């Protein structure tokens, strides 16, 4: 678990229930993985409206667990979607995949 996320989760729910912390983190990692897979397809199709919705979902997920580093990359993806900029979207997605590979 990324230290930044662990610290944020402990502040929110305490550290007494390690199972809860691990469950929240596992759900987060799963959700992010699913959304990034969707984003890849949406970029390939040039479906920027759908990509914006996916990026919005990712924004919520990252902010819910205090993952500010990934949140910043998600915002770059969302900006690219709003601008219908496939090159910027691909760059942002590559950064997100790099960040999430560390999870």
Residue spans for each PLM region:
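Two-component system phosphorelay core
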Residues: 1-53, 57-59, 63-103
């Amino acid at each position: 678990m990324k230290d930044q996320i662990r610290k944020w989760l402990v502040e929110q729910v305490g550290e007494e229930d390690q199972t809860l912390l691990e469950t929240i983190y596992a759900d987060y990692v799963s959700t992010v993985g699913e959304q990034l897979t969707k984003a890849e397809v949406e970029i390939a199709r040039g479906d920027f409206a759908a990509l914006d919705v996916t990026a919005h979902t990712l924004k919520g997920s990252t902010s819910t667990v205090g993952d500010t580093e990934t949140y910043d990359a998600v915002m770059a993806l969302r900006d690219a979607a709003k601008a219908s900029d496939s090159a910027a979207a691909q760059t942002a997605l590559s950064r997100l995949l790099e960040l999430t590979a560390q999870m």
